[in-house]
UniProtKB/Swiss-Prot annotation:
Residues 1-181 form the TCTP domain. Transmembrane segments: none annotated. SUPFAM superfamilies: Mss4-like. Keywords: Calcium, Cytoplasm. Involved in calcium binding and microtubule stabilization. This is Translationally-controlled tumor protein homolog. InterPro entries: Mss4-like_sf, Mss4/transl-control_tumour, TCTP, Translation_control_tumour_CS, Translational_control_tumour_p. PROSITE patterns: TCTP_1, TCTP_2, TCTP_3. One of its GO terms (molecular function) is calcium ion binding.
């Protein structure tokens, strides 16, 4: 399994256990779903709890958590402060500068850096459109939530599909470290 970690805080933000695709060579999108499960239980996509010997209802004292599977699995924390347009724009400006510096440090070519600088503004602007922006949710990893660094803000958007509204997690590829587990 591949774990996608924030390059600045080392927070786990996603994994390849979710359907994923790379958009425009720039943004990883992870498809999630709403789940209800016992607190602390991590269920990987495609797992079948009944086939793994789990009992049904074991009592009423059990804590249940509800939410998006990738948010629960990676213990992401919702951050409402980024719902303010000015705050989010300011964050994006400083974060993208850090990403470019990271790309330079990691030995990316000038062509790769120029391509990133050319493409990323269009993605940010697409998020900022009024109708889209008010529908977004923003999450951060545990270390960033504890004040241990300033890293990537995970953007979640619900999209209408045949099955209803489906949550998608969007992360900037160049600000992630892929770690094999």
């Amino acid at each position: 399994m591949l774990i996608f970690k924030d390059a600045f805080t080392d927070d786990e933000l996603a994994s390849d256990s979710f359907p994923m695709k790379l958009v425009d060579g720039l943004i990883w999108e992870f498809k999630g779903r709403q789940v209800v499960r016992r607190e602390g239980e991590i269920q990987l996509a495609g797992a079948n709890p009944s086939a793994e010997g789990e009992d049904g209802d074991e009592g009423s004292e059990e804590c249940v958590e509800r939410g998006i599977d990738f948010v629960l699995n990676h213990r992401l924390q919702e951050m409402n402060c980024y719902e303010d347009l000015v705050t989010f724009k300011s964050y994006c400006k400083s974060f993208m500068k850090k990403v470019v510096e990271l790309m330079q440090k990691n030995g990316k070519s000038e062509a790769e850096i120029s391509e990133f600088k050319r493409k990323i503004p269009a993605w940010v602007v697409s998020l900022l459109s009024k109708d889209r922006f008010k529908q977004l949710q923003f999450f951060i990893g545990e270390r960033m939530a504890e004040g241990q660094g300033e890293g990537q803000v995970a953007v979640v958007e619900y999209r209408d599909e045949e099955d209803g509204e489906v949550p998608y997690l969007m992360l900037v590829k160049e600000a992630l470290i892929e770690e094999k587990q």
